[in-house]
Amino acid sequence: MDKQVNVVNYRELKKIPYILLLLQNGVNDHDFTRISVSDLSKQMGTTPQNISKVLRRLEREGYIVRSSVKGEVSVMLSEKGSALLRNLMDLMENLLGKNITIVLRGIVVTGFGEGSYYISLEGYRRQFISKLGFDPYPGTLNVKLLDQYMKYRLYLERVPGVRIEGFSNGSRTYGGVKAFKCTISDIPCGVLLIERTSHGPEVIEIVAPVKLRDRLGLKDGDDVTINILL
């Protein structure tokens, strides 16, 4: 069955260059990022007044959330803004006839042993099943990215992914997670970008329906290639 693609109308298309500009300056959909209106205006070849006007319009129409404290402006992409970019990506995929894929490479490393606890929490597990399409093995595969692939890791911070919402069990609050569907050796998996983590940005965690170390015979130091489907 063909994938249904939501129509991106002309009014929305006019906003995309400005939203992409924000993404290029570090804005994402899970926390506020401080921006420079002056720098944005130089990058777009327009005036700071026009950029401020555009930001107010994007905020008024619900594409971004904006905060201004002591003259410093911070911006976060809203769910509506993320949805617009997803629709654009779906449209591109439909027109090009293929998926957009980002390839990451790294080596397997030992984690802190926390993955099994967090993945087993029902508040996360239910969302992995409904949003990633599989019941996860209670644990994660930790991969340390090679230096030349870190730029793609940073790119993922800036684009919409699958939002795994945080939750509270009454005694503790658990943070949200951005996920991306991916494959490792044709096994469906999910790359997790975790808001609260003890790892540095060079280490990513992979969730899958099976224990990847056992299924693929992986040990610390082994190379891994991750194909992320946008």
From Swiss-Prot:
Where along this sequence does the record place binding of Mg(2+)?
140, 142
Q: Which GO terms describe its molecular function?
A: DNA-binding transcription factor activity; magnesium ion binding; nucleotide binding; riboflavin kinase activity; sequence-specific DNA binding
| Entries under InterPro entries matching the protein | ArsR-like_HTH (IPR011991), AsnC-type_HTH_dom (IPR000485), HTH_MarR-typ (IPR000835), RibK_CTP-dep (IPR039063), Riboflavin_kinase_archaeal (IPR023470), Riboflavin_kinase_CTP-dep (IPR023602), Riboflavin_kinase_dom_sf (IPR023465), WH-like_DNA-bd_sf (IPR036388)
Cofactor requirement: Mg(2+)
Q: Which GO terms describe its biological process?
A: FMN biosynthetic process; riboflavin biosynthetic process
This protein's name? Riboflavin kinase
Q: Which species does the entry assign this protein to? A: Caldivirga maquilingensis (strain ATCC 700844 / DSM 13496 / JCM 10307 / IC-167)
Annotated region H-T-H motif-like: the residues are: 1-101
Query: Does the keyword field hold Signal?
Result: no
Supply the gene name: ribK
